[in-house]
From Swiss-Prot:
Substrate binds at residue 221. The modification N6-carboxylysine is found at residue 219. The gene is ureC. Pfam families: Amidohydro_1, Urease_alpha. This is Urease subunit alpha. It comes from Magnetococcus marinus (strain ATCC BAA-1437 / JCM 17883 / MC-1). Carboxylation allows a single lysine to coordinate two nickel ions. Keywords: Cytoplasm, Hydrolase, Metal-binding, Nickel. Transmembrane segments: none annotated.
């Protein structure tokens, strides 16, 4: 006999369905379910007296006969392509299906087969997102990986060799020897990783040897001399070898102005780091680059969002990170030239307009590695409060804004760095790098982090308790982060040249190496929900920023969500 549930009871049992709305943590952001892949009355759920039992929701199908390794049931997927309710099937470490799970022998419309070999993860009442991608990493210490993983980041791209002065300031792993050592170090770290070689050179040979050693991209940094000549050579090498170039431009305008740097690009694609400028770049108008069709602009998280404390903390950060001396007036002037209220305020609005495409950390080098996701949603919330609903929103929800902001740390850095074939969204065929959140903790504290289908991190209670939940609950590495499972739960991204040169055998690597692909054929138009190219103007005296003639300014936030309500310290 059929039984009708009211919406509240249904949501409590199986999670929200079409038309239901969910608040994201303590923000003003509201999402609404757009589609539900289930068949009402045939939902699957694990537990005592529930559906996933032998002969009911669990079939007799073996793995060879199509049963999945893991099913995530009734999850609310939040991704750039939609906000939908679905079951998710995982097999061989990849997402194999998004749809309806169950037993095809007794249930209709089943496209994810549950069998005796299937593990179940309860997605009811929880949000599922793709693992985040942080594409601006200074590899200063390996402990960054743990903090990032616990925050929901599953891929980290950047450069460095440890706490050397070169790494503290620049995201470069210079030379084949250091690249080999970092790839070997990555063998023991449960994170997808990729390493940028140093891109500052006026001849190509020193850059090409780094790509043959497995660098997944090149980084131009002003502390190594980002001259027009170095820019041109680096981009020429990248065009030949199909890798991305990231750039930190010339704050002091010693070798040219922003117009000279733009000319040196010659229309070629480039990832512009901290395009607002507080993290470095042509003062005061590097922000103009977000209007260029070939420039893929990102922010680093210390300026996200603009608050009453943003300016005060930046000066000291900058002095430390760039090896400056407060006793030298020129060093102080260099630091002060980068910190501008007007451009930081404009950055908030440019993110909301989709003119800034990505957000990353700048880990331990004027950025916080565990706060990429938090700062992204704090920015989205601040803009909702200050600017209201986006014009393209339909209904009483913020779906379009949420899709825009989640793309900034998932699909867009994946596209930018040639890894979107593997990661960056909840999509069939991609690695099962997935994050589950309770709505009340969305963006700030994940429940589970899966790496290639294996749980690698979780909020876990006392291991000596009789159940998993007693205090103290804190993040702990799970089985996917240990032993031989680790090298099957994470990958490293390298150049095709490195793969062709058999660096796995040369360096004794066990992690899967995947080549970056398609880095040179993309542009701003490929940045999902973040492809705007406004005409940018910056007043050199007042630093006022205009986009398409409109002054961009906003007040600093005095209170933020996802902050002290969730943390003791």
């Amino acid at each position: 006999m059929a039984y009708t549930l009211d919406r509240g009871s249904y949501a409590a049992m199986f999670g929200p369905t079409v038309g239901d709305r969910v608040r994201l943590a303590d923000t003003e952001l509201i999402i609404e379910v757009e589609q539900d892949y289930t068949t009402y009355g045939e939902e699957v759920k694990f537990g005592g007296g529930k559906v996933i039992r032998d002969g009911m929701g669990q079939s007799q199908h073996s793995r060879q006969e199509g049963a999945v390794d893991t099913v995530i049931t009734n999850a609310l997927i939040v991704d750039h392509w939609g906000i939908v309710k679905a079951d998710v099937g995982i097999k061989d470490g990849r997402i194999c299906a998004i749809g309806k799970a169950g037993n095809p022998d007794v249930q209709p419309n089943v496209d994810i087969i549950i069998g005796p070999g299937t593990e179940a993860i309860a997605g009811e009442g929880r949000i599922l997102t793709a693992g985040g991608i942080d594409a601006h990493i200074h590899w200063i210490c390996p402990q960054q990986i743990e903090d990032a993983l616990h925050s929901g980041i599953t891929t980290m791209l950047g450069g460095g060799t440890g706490p050397a002065e070169g790494t503290n300031a620049t995201t470069c792993t210079p030379g084949p020897w250091h690249i080999a050592r970092m790839l070997q170090a990555a063998e023991g770290l449960p994170m997808n990783m990729g390493f940028f070689g140093k891109g500052n050179a006026s001849r190509p040979q020193g850059l090409e040897e780094q790509l043959r050693a497995g660098a997944c991209g090149l980084k131009l940094h002003e502390d190594w001399g980002t001259t027009p000549s170095a820019i041109d050579v680096c981009l020429s090498v990248a065009e030949k070898w199909d890798v991305q170039v990231a750039i930190h431009t010339d704050t002091l305008n010693e070798s040219g102005f922003v117009e000279n740097t733009t000319a040196a690009f010659k229309g070629r694609t480039i990832h512009a780091f901290h395009t607002e400028g507080a993290g470095g770049g042509h003062a005061p108008d590097i922000i103009k680059l977000c209007g260029e069709a070939n420039v893929l602009p990102s922010s680093t998280n210390p300026t996200r969002p603009f608050t009453r404390n943003t300016l005060d903390e930046h000066l000291d950060m900058l002095m430390v990170c760039h090896h400056l001396d407060s006793r030298i007036p020129e060093d102080v002037a260099f630091a002060e030239s980068r910190i501008r209220r007007e451009t930081i305020a404009a950055e908030d609005i440019l993110h909301d307009l989709g003119a800034f495409s990505m957000i990353a950390s700048d880990s331990q080098a004027m950025g916080r590695v565990g706060e990429v996701i938090i700062r992204t949603w704090q920015t989205a919330d601040k803009m909702k409060r200050q600017r209201g609903a986006l014009p393209e929103e339909r209904g009483q929800n913020d779906n379009q804004r949420v899709k825009r902001y989640i793309a900034k740390y998932t699909i867009n850095p994946a596209i930018t760095h040639g890894i979107a074939h593997y990661v960056g969204s909840v999509a069939v065929g991609k690695l099962a790098d997935l994050v589950l959140w309770k709505p009340m903790f969305f963006g700030v504290k994940p429940d589970l982090v899966l790496k290639c289908g294996t749980i690698a991190s979780a909020a876990m209670g006392d291991p000596n308790a009789s159940i998993p939940t007693p205090q103290p609950v804190h993040y702990r590495p799970m089985f996917g982060a240990f032993g031989g499972a680790l090298t099957h739960s994470a990958v490293n991204f390298v150049s095709q040249a490195g793969l062709d040169g058999e660096i796995a055998q040369q360096f004794g690597l066990r992690k899967t190496l995947l080549p970056v692909v398609g880095c040179r054929t993309i542009g701003k138009a490929d940045m999902v929900h973040n492809s705007a190219t406004p005409h940018m103007e910056v007043d050199p005296e007042t630093y006022e920023v205009r986009a398409d003639g409109r002054l961009l300014t906003c007040e600093p936030a005095t209170v933020l969500p996802l902050a002290q309500r969730y943390f003791l310290f």
